[in-house]
């Protein structure tokens, strides 16, 4: 069987696609996967290094653009649709899966026009406009959070969770805490870092003076901010490992007592799988404010706490950190609730559902020929 996985742009869209690809390829040595993305997305840099096949098309968003840019974007979408039809003809997939991002729409639309089985995966609690539209023309919709269910046709929507990279699932080992031990904090703002989160941590340090000796911080800053953040920790005398990018996230999660992070869908999936208590700082400019809605989904279940960026100060962040340090039972309860929300078999569920749909279609064709 052949599968096209379309989308990307950010790690939040791409990493679930990689998890699905790995599961699909593991099912049969004859299976093939082709990713389709854009040259500006993270997929163009990452997928060739990981050994996956990748085709590039022209696509961009329209939201928030002026009239001229919207016209240009529409032109790119039409060209991307033409490119998508060519890719479908050459690769001849049995299945197409859109995982979000600019490349998702042209491929799924082209698949509909050519009669190819097509699906989408929605990572967030609140879907964007593209997936809301595509949800009406696909054979199946896979959602990560129950809040998204109301936006799609009930008869084709399945709650699967958000697929997690195998290196996170297989490599995670939680450290054993002991009384009087150090307190380890993992800080990251997504695959590219987040300058506002970085600054908030540095601003919080003077308010953590009484516990500085206990703190051990691992901080993913993004490439542009690493030097500034490293100097900030050194000036405050806090032991911190500052990295532009963390390659081994499973080890980083395993060592952490607390995570300070954004609230993208992939982050949510990973921290729940690892059962981590989190202080979420949602990115305020995410489409349709979906990061805030993602975080609220966990906060309402006592599986995390949230500080909106508009309310973010070093003092407020320090107060949250101190509160969780001083109340380990509350942190442990948060971890338990987060772990209960994890869906570790998301990739398997998605692949199984797509394969079953395809088999049903093949049987229908055979029955029609038999008549």
From Swiss-Prot:
Record localization: Cell inner membrane
GO molecular function: UDP-N-acetyl-D-glucosamine:N-acetylmuramoyl-L-alanyl-D-glutamyl-meso-2,6-diaminopimelyl-D-alanyl-D-alanine-diphosphoundecaprenol 4-beta-N-acetylglucosaminlytransferase activity; undecaprenyldiphospho-muramoylpentapeptide beta-N-acetylglucosaminyltransferase activity
GO BP term, pick one: carbohydrate metabolic process
EC number(s) reported in the record: 2.4.1.227
Topology versus the membrane: Peripheral membrane protein
Stored HAMAP family: MurG
Entry function: Cell wall formation. Catalyzes the transfer of a GlcNAc subunit on undecaprenyl-pyrophosphoryl-MurNAc-pentapeptide (lipid intermediate I) to form undecaprenyl-pyrophosphoryl-MurNAc-(pentapeptide)GlcNAc (lipid intermediate II).
Protein name (Swiss-Prot/TrEMBL): UDP-N-acetylglucosamine--N-acetylmuramyl-(pentapeptide) pyrophosphoryl-undecaprenol N-acetylglucosamine transferase
Gene that specifies this protein: murG
């Amino acid at each position: 069987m052949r599968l096209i996985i379309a989308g990307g742009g950010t790690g939040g869209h791409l990493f679930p696609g990689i998890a699905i690809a790995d599961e699909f390829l593991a099912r049969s040595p004859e299976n093939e996967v082709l990713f389709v993305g854009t040259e500006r997305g993270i997929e163009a840099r990452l997928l060739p290094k990981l050994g996956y096949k990748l085709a590039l098309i022209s696509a961009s968003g329209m939201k928030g653009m002026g009239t001229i840019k919207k016209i240009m974007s529409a032109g790119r979408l039409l060209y991307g649709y033409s490119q998508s039809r060519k890719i479908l003809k050459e690769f001849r997939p049995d299945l197409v899966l859109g995982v979000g991002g600019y490349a998702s729409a042209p491929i799924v639309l082209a698949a509909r026009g050519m009669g190819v089985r097509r699906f989408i995966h929605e990572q967030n609690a609140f879907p964007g406009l593209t997936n809301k539209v595509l949800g009406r023309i696909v054979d199946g919709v896979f959602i990560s959070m129950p809040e998204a269910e109301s936006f799609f046709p009930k008869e084709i929507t399945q709650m699967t969770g958000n697929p997690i990279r195998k290196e996170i699932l297989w490599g995670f080992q939680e450290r054993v805490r002991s009384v009087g031990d150090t307190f380890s904090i993992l800080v990251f703002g997504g695959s590219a870092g987040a300058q506002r989160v970085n600054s908030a941590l540095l601003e919080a340090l003077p308010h953590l003076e009484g516990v500085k000796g206990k703190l051990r911080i691992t901080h993913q800053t993004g490439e542009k901010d690493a030097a500034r953040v490293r100097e900030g920790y050194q000036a405050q005398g806090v032991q911190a490992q500052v990295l532009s990018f963390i390659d081994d996230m499973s080890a980083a999660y395993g060592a952490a007592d607390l995570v300070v992070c954004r609230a993208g869908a992939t982050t949510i999936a990973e921290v729940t799988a690892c059962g981590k208590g989190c202080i979420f700082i949602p990115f305020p400019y995410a489409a349709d404010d979906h990061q805030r809605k993602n975080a609220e989904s966990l906060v309402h279940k006592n599986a995390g706490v949230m500080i909106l960026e508009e309310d973010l100060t070093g003092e407020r962040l320090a107060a949250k950190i101190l509160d969780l340090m001083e109340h380990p039972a509350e942190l442990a309860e948060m971890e338990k609730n987060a772990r209960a929300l994890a869906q570790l078999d998301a990739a398997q569920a998605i692949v199984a559902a797509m394969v079953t749909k395809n088999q049903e279609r093949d049987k229908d064709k055979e029955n029609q020929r038999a008549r």
